[in-house]
Amino acid sequence: MNAFQKKEISLDERQAKSTAWALTFADVVTLLLTFFVLLLVMLSDAENRLSTLIENLLDETYEEMTTGLAYDNISVDRETKGIKITITGNLFKSTSAEVDPKYYEVIHQIGKLIAKSDLMNIEELVEHKALLETFEQNGVSLNVEVRCEGHTDDAKLPPNSNYPSNWELSAARSLNLVRLMNKHAGMPEKYFSALGYGEFRPVIDVAKIDNFDEKQEARAKNRRVEIYLDAFFENIIQKQEKIEIDIKT
């Protein structure tokens, strides 16, 4: 009887030992889940802080540009996608993508204001380095972008034009403006991008205007260049994959 009891105890012990790993495994899984939840909360908090920081820096830059770009043919607006600087008037000669030299000073001023802004130099601000490093360690980078968008009116180009359509003309104009800004601002080219929309995103729909003078005035407003200053988060791995795809294509 005693031998039988010892055998039963021995089986119980073996069963207990055989399931002991499950309890340890469950504890490890619980700890890992807790760690990842805590990490997500910390990243979310850091992202909110950085988003608030970016918005504050954009607000400051907007105020500086509003004061520093007090020209009749330039408007500065604070939008959800950053700061928009709109240049109208005879920035370019008719059917040409060359910037009129009389606007060089204005472009120089725009470039310098952007280059000196805290947003453009955020990585050099000591008080924000720890926050940026937290993101970089988790595979996320902050990108600052200066995007130039060219727009023309709906008038057809003459047969002897250097450009087949307003699309190409608007793209060439925005690219030339970007080059000038890059030259005057002294910033790396990686911050800049140029787009051309032709006549397809007008401020005023001239098709609804019958009066000739009013139509010409509307077309003058549609001929414009918009410069956007913005910042956004980007996954470093996805960014690298995108660069590799662009290189291959």
List each language-model region with its residue ranges.
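Structured segments of extracytoplasmic/periplasmic soluble domains
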Residues: 60, 64, 68, 109-121, ...
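Envelope-exposed proteins and targeting segments
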Residues: 70-72, 79-83, 87-90, 95, ...
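Short amphipathic alpha-helical segments
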Residues: 49, 53-57, 61, 102, ...
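Periplasmic OmpA-like peptidoglycan-binding domain that tethers envelope proteins to the cell wall
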Residues: 99-101, 128-249
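Solvent-exposed residues in well-ordered beta-strands and their adjoining turns
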Residues: 38, 88, 115, 228-232
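Short, solvent-exposed beta-strand/turn patches at coil↔beta or beta↔helix junctions
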Residues: 79-124, 155-164
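Short terminal targeting/anchoring segments
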Residues: 1-88
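Short beta-strand elements
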Residues: 68-81, 121-136, 140-147
